[in-house]
């Protein structure tokens, strides 16, 4: 990672069980990056919040919990390339697209993460590099705690982001 590249790590979440994963990642990355002047870490409750923070950002890491039924991996990393989410193996299939589309898009007036990233591109605010960390979750009930599996995947997400920040 280029030390001069301004990086934003955004953790999306809520108080609903495994949906806390993005916030947990943000808190842990922030505690590990206090001396990194080029790194900003924020917590968001809706993807649209991220749009307000993109000015001057070169690299964006977005961390969010989602229900993934097509894959048994607890953590998946996607790069946004020319409007498409690409993982290390193949282009994102329609099931994953639907998963990302539904992330925090609960009403007709809400924007899901893909919508926010498309809007950022249209208004020329999309960072040069966008990485989405999809953390598998199973329990999204209000007031529930995080499951052991999702907590572990969130911890692994922190490790992976820190590796990239130190490159």
Describe the role of every protein-language-model region.
Residues 1-128, 132-135, 144-155, 160-167:
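N-terminal catalytic or cofactor-binding beta/alpha core of small enzyme domains
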Residues 139:
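Conserved catalytic-site region of short-chain dehydrogenase/reductase
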């Amino acid at each position: 990672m280029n030390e001069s590249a301004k990086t934003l790590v955004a953790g999306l979440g809520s108080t609903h069980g495994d949906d806390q994963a993005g916030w947990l990642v943000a808190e842990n990355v922030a505690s590990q990056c206090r001396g990194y002047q080029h790194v900003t870490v924020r917590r968001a409750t809706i993807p649209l919040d991220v749009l307000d923070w993109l000015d001057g950002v070169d690299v964006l890491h977005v961390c969010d919990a989602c229900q993934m039924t097509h894959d048994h991996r607890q953590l998946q990393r996607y790069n946004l390339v020319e409007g498409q989410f690409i993982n290390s193996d193949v282009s994102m299939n329609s099931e994953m697209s639907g998963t990302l589309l539904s992330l925090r898009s609960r009403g007709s007036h809400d924007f899901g993460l893909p919508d926010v990233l498309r809007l950022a591109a249209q208004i020329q605010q999309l960072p040069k590099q966008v990485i989405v960390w999809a953390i598998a979750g199973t329990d999204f009930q209000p007031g529930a705690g995080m499951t052991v599996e999702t907590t572990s995947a969130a911890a692994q997400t922190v490790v992976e982001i820190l590796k990239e920040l130190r490159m």
